[in-house]
Amino acid sequence: MPKPVILPESQVERIEQILDELRAKTRASYVFLADISGQLINARGITGATDLVTLAALTASNMAATAEMARQIGESQPFRLMFHEGTKRNIYLSQVGNSFLLAVVFDIEVQIGLVRLFSKRATEELLALADEYEKIVQQTPSMMEAGFDTSLDEALDTLLNPSKKTPGDQIIIR
């Protein structure tokens, strides 16, 4: 299992504040911040039955796949934004620096322009924290190398083998 990055309390509080503001301004069901390996860092809102650990790992793999798509078509940088439109809910993903991803899950009644505007602002605010995080990661590179595969494997195993999941696996978000 990848080693979790321990963030100072002041950074955790700032992340929570940014996520709370984003959720309120966009009327999102929930928002979360994960590292690029798929480890959930923080989440705010009402997730219902959603397994955020699995969703974080899947969004990270989605970002990795689209980064390769960008490379394949000749882009010099990975795509920074993604939007998935559903019949009930949508997901808007933003890459924050090189190590974070921000996800906004919202009902179809919410205007995408609103989500895009406030996600961009939140991403800009999170960039300073991402820079600090990336310095920590550079000091422990093995965490990022092993983290993505392990997180994705565990998330897919839990998703595909629900009998292994216990009631204690639930994440409670303030």
Question: Where are these predicted regions, by residue range?
Answer:
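Acidic, low-complexity cytosolic segments
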Residues: M1-Y30, S37-R174
